[in-house]
Amino acid sequence: MRIALFVFPAAASVGLIAWAQSESSDQAKPRILSLSHAIHAVGDLDTTLAFYREVFGLNGMPRDFPNPAVPLLTDAPGVTLRLSMMRLPGSMQFELTHFKGLERKPGRAAYTDPGAASIVLYVRDIDAAVANAQKTNAPIVTTGGAPVEITTAKGKARSILLRDPDGFFVQVTQEQPAAGAPEGNVHRVSLAYTMESAEATARFYNGMIGLELSGPSAFSKDPATLKLVGAPEGTEFRKLTGVMPGPNAYVEFTEFRGVPRKKFHLRVRDPGAPAMAVQVNDLTGMLALLKAAGTHVISSKGQIVDFGGGTHTIFVEDPNGMNIEVFERTGSVDTRK
């Protein structure tokens, strides 16, 4: 299958960043099957779980995960893992990981830094969520410290950006829930990431991972968005958006310019490190594509790790500095769930 990046002219000054694929019957090409879960490395699992429970009513059960493959997967000899797999509305899963046994270096990104990540929680009552967050002394990133009015695909909405105890970004947006939405304040979830380059991000996710992302090539200066993320006036941005298969979760990548940026990359074990885990149909083929493109492989010796239960996996770094766990499953269910 031939894949190429194009910028399609839509107007004199506006284009579309997308990928064109030639017709092919090759269904065996390595590609994403599903987003398994978003990942967030934490400094203390109990503290972070308490935050999400007290602020948003989201619950998770902490447990030790004594899998001997973890040190190889994360290239951290001697490390041990305690985790909680939180099940969120819309079949989304959010894995909180607490690594022990080795030194860790916490890190916090600016929202405009490539590699920064945010979980977006859509709520029925944003004022209640903000009040709960203030009780925990959660840092508020949004300029002015209060929700701002933004425009979403569903119309006008109130939104605010804050940090959890590890500095991970949490965007809270109030919107009317769809019919049949789960009970509780949080009724929907999406993911948001900051990218260094829209073109490089499209080459990685569209061209190799097989995730369909697209967006305008032109930059915008929407004041409400800049206020939401705490960016200075004059900052410009553009987005790539798509839907992650599996939970059918909306995902967006934002590139900023006109503001100082520093690529944010932490080791898998470092508190504040974001990641995502994606299931693919052909891990060996996918890894060959990634290595041929010069992708940094994190796992020990750059090799696929047998995780047990028919699961084989590896960690790589995307062009923006974020860690991506890519895995193939041929046997039983992943024991982390």
Regions flagged by a language model, labelled:
Residues A4-G15:
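Bacterial N-terminal signal peptides
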Residues P68-L72, E103-G107, A178-A179, K221-L226, ...:
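A short, acidic/glycine-rich surface segment
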Residues Q21-P30, L33-D44, R63, L81-K100, K105-A133, A157-R163, ...:
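Vicinal oxygen chelate
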Residues K29, T74-A76, R108-T112, T151, ...:
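Short consensus segments that form the blades of beta-propeller domains
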Residues P30, H40-S91, K154, Y193-N248, ...:
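Core segments of cupin and vicinal oxygen chelate
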